[in-house]
């Protein structure tokens, strides 16, 4: 187990610098430097299984860590942490490993090891003219962390990142290595499961329970993703009438309003997001409206996400100022709204990878999301605005993002 390195008790801090604590043991997991991809993957699986077996035998706690986007100190209660960001193998399975009932192109399948970052997977796919089906607001999460914690997606009619998953390789203990997929849509066959030394389980309920499970089912070692041909997203980021925003946030009836996107008249957006300043809620909100277009033969990366057009460090920016000037939340956000919110964009086109890209967060920032039914959106927003008005200011901005309901049992996006 030279690939598993025990660093002993260590201070651990999350990416947003909002949580810090002492772990009982910081464990660094890595793959072998020699051998085929499959050999490396299986050797690491054996290491992880042995590590879990020892932990269970000694009745200790252990949990994997991905991109350090955790927001809770629960992980530090006498718990060992496995850092997985070196576990980045990925490959496309062969046709012989695919279930014969799977009629789609097997080249639209990607098997990714748990520590692979969304960004690296997107680059890998981009080089093959492929794309993830959806993304969160940025790309710093590991694939296992993103799905098991229910990271939101970006597509109105698709869903979250975890909704593109068609199989999970979960290690529970020594000699307990499973590949779980839906019985109603089995994508891989016994040959694939055997190649990663796993027992194949076809079970819809088990799959939906394990998909968003915060690691409670075991160590998610590998994730089978269904991807698609790359596509462009045409971006309109503009202020829209408050009355139109109120209609859309409860109905998504785009034909009932007049959006500033004349070239896309009659088309349903791929993505719709509203940005609201809670200290000036009667102002026309900023809307980010994206339309899906076929991918090009050749692609030249635009400057769409440069600081000049979209301030990717908005949360960190707010945090730095308000930390140094307590009580300045309302004043700062109102004065600097034009710098905090994205600038107007008109018909700029980019791949999914370049549209939802890097986010740099500095300072002790906190971001959270709650899932609500579509028809309760305006009511929920009104409650949040009243809370801020009644109980003091919070250095925050609100973003409303609309995604399809997920079948994952613990997904926060469980409402229609």
For each feature predicted by the language model, list its residue ranges.
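Noncatalytic alpha-helical scaffold of FAD-dependent oxidoreductases
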Residues: 1-416
